[in-house]
Protein backbone atom coordinates (compact mmCIF):
# COMPACT_ATOMS: atom_id res chain seq x y z
CA UNK A 1 0.00 0.00 0.00
CA UNK A 2 1.29 3.44 -0.86
CA UNK A 3 0.79 6.53 1.27
CA UNK A 4 0.62 9.95 -0.33
CA UNK A 5 0.28 13.61 0.56
CA UNK A 6 -1.67 15.58 -2.00
CA UNK A 7 -1.73 19.38 -2.14
CA UNK A 8 -4.64 20.86 -4.08
CA UNK A 9 -4.62 24.54 -5.00
CA UNK A 10 -7.23 26.77 -6.56
CA UNK A 11 -7.69 30.41 -7.46
CA UNK A 12 -10.54 32.75 -6.57
CA UNK A 13 -11.68 32.29 -10.18
CA UNK A 14 -11.86 28.48 -9.90
CA UNK A 15 -13.04 28.18 -6.27
CA UNK A 16 -16.72 27.80 -7.11
CA UNK A 17 -16.09 25.33 -9.92
CA UNK A 18 -13.87 23.20 -7.69
CA UNK A 19 -16.42 23.23 -4.88
CA UNK A 20 -19.19 22.21 -7.26
CA UNK A 21 -17.05 19.46 -8.81
CA UNK A 22 -15.93 18.12 -5.42
CA UNK A 23 -19.54 18.17 -4.17
CA UNK A 24 -20.47 15.72 -6.95
CA UNK A 25 -17.88 13.30 -5.56
CA UNK A 26 -19.06 13.73 -1.96
CA UNK A 27 -22.76 13.51 -2.86
CA UNK A 28 -22.26 10.52 -5.16
CA UNK A 29 -23.42 12.23 -8.36
CA UNK A 30 -20.04 12.24 -10.14
CA UNK A 31 -19.55 9.79 -13.02
CA UNK A 32 -19.36 6.16 -11.90
CA UNK A 33 -15.69 5.87 -12.89
CA UNK A 34 -14.87 8.78 -10.56
CA UNK A 35 -16.86 7.34 -7.67
CA UNK A 36 -15.26 3.91 -8.17
CA UNK A 37 -11.86 5.61 -8.24
CA UNK A 38 -12.49 7.57 -5.05
CA UNK A 39 -13.66 4.37 -3.33
CA UNK A 40 -10.10 3.04 -3.81
CA UNK A 41 -8.67 5.93 -1.77
CA UNK A 42 -8.39 5.55 2.01
CA UNK A 43 -8.41 9.15 3.25
CA UNK A 44 -6.49 9.53 6.51
CA UNK A 45 -7.07 13.26 6.86
CA UNK A 46 -7.91 16.29 4.76
CA UNK A 47 -7.19 19.80 5.96
CA UNK A 48 -8.23 22.99 4.17
CA UNK A 49 -6.64 26.44 4.35
CA UNK A 50 -9.22 28.84 2.93
CA UNK A 51 -6.88 31.81 3.41
CA UNK A 52 -4.31 30.15 1.15
CA UNK A 53 -6.67 28.48 -1.33
CA UNK A 54 -5.28 25.02 -0.73
CA UNK A 55 -6.05 21.70 0.86
CA UNK A 56 -3.77 18.93 2.03
CA UNK A 57 -4.89 15.32 1.98
CA UNK A 58 -3.06 12.33 3.43
CA UNK A 59 -4.30 9.08 1.95
CA UNK A 60 -3.39 5.51 1.14
CA UNK A 61 -4.02 3.46 -1.98
CA UNK A 62 -3.43 -0.25 -2.53
CA UNK A 63 -0.60 -0.79 -5.01
CA UNK A 64 -2.93 -2.58 -7.43
CA UNK A 65 -5.29 0.44 -7.44
CA UNK A 66 -2.76 3.25 -8.06
CA UNK A 67 -3.72 3.76 -11.72
CA UNK A 68 -7.48 3.64 -11.16
CA UNK A 69 -7.25 5.99 -8.17
CA UNK A 70 -5.90 8.70 -10.48
CA UNK A 71 -9.25 9.05 -12.25
CA UNK A 72 -10.32 11.46 -9.49
CA UNK A 73 -7.36 13.72 -10.34
CA UNK A 74 -8.32 13.75 -14.01
CA UNK A 75 -11.88 14.69 -13.02
CA UNK A 76 -10.59 17.71 -11.05
CA UNK A 77 -7.68 18.79 -13.24
CA UNK A 78 -9.44 21.65 -15.04
CA UNK A 79 -10.57 23.36 -11.82
CA UNK A 80 -7.45 23.07 -9.64
CA UNK A 81 -3.81 22.06 -9.58
CA UNK A 82 -2.63 19.03 -7.66
CA UNK A 83 0.71 17.85 -6.37
CA UNK A 84 1.09 14.34 -4.97
CA UNK A 85 4.06 13.09 -2.97
CA UNK A 86 4.73 9.52 -1.90
CA UNK A 87 5.52 9.47 1.82
CA UNK A 88 6.03 7.05 4.71
CA UNK A 89 4.56 7.23 8.18
CA UNK A 90 6.62 8.45 11.12
CA UNK A 91 6.54 4.93 12.52
CA UNK A 92 8.07 3.58 9.29
CA UNK A 93 10.65 6.37 9.34
CA UNK A 94 11.67 5.21 12.82
CA UNK A 95 12.17 1.69 11.41
CA UNK A 96 14.46 3.14 8.73
CA UNK A 97 16.48 4.91 11.44
CA UNK A 98 16.76 1.69 13.42
CA UNK A 99 17.99 -0.17 10.34
CA UNK A 100 20.59 2.49 9.55
CA UNK A 101 21.50 4.59 12.61
CA UNK A 102 22.99 8.02 11.91
CA UNK A 103 26.35 7.01 13.40
CA UNK A 104 26.69 4.42 10.60
CA UNK A 105 26.18 7.02 7.87
CA UNK A 106 29.51 8.46 6.72
CA UNK A 107 29.89 12.19 7.20
CA UNK A 108 30.08 14.03 3.89
CA UNK A 109 33.25 15.76 2.89
CA UNK A 110 33.14 19.51 3.15
CA UNK A 111 31.64 21.03 0.04
CA UNK A 112 33.67 24.18 0.42
CA UNK A 113 37.35 24.52 1.07
Question: What residues fall within each predicted segment?
Answer:
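Short, surface-exposed basic-aromatic patches at helix termini and helix-loop junctions that form
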Residues: 72-77
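Short S/T/G/P-rich N-terminal loop/turn motif that feeds into the first structured element of a domain
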Residues: 1-53, 62-69, 90-113
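Conserved short beta-strand edge segments in small beta-sheet-based binding/regulatory domains
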Residues: 78-89
Amino acid sequence: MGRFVSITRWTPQTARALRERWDTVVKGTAPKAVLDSFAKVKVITQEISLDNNLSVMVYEVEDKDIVEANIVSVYLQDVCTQEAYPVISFEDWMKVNEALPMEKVPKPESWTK
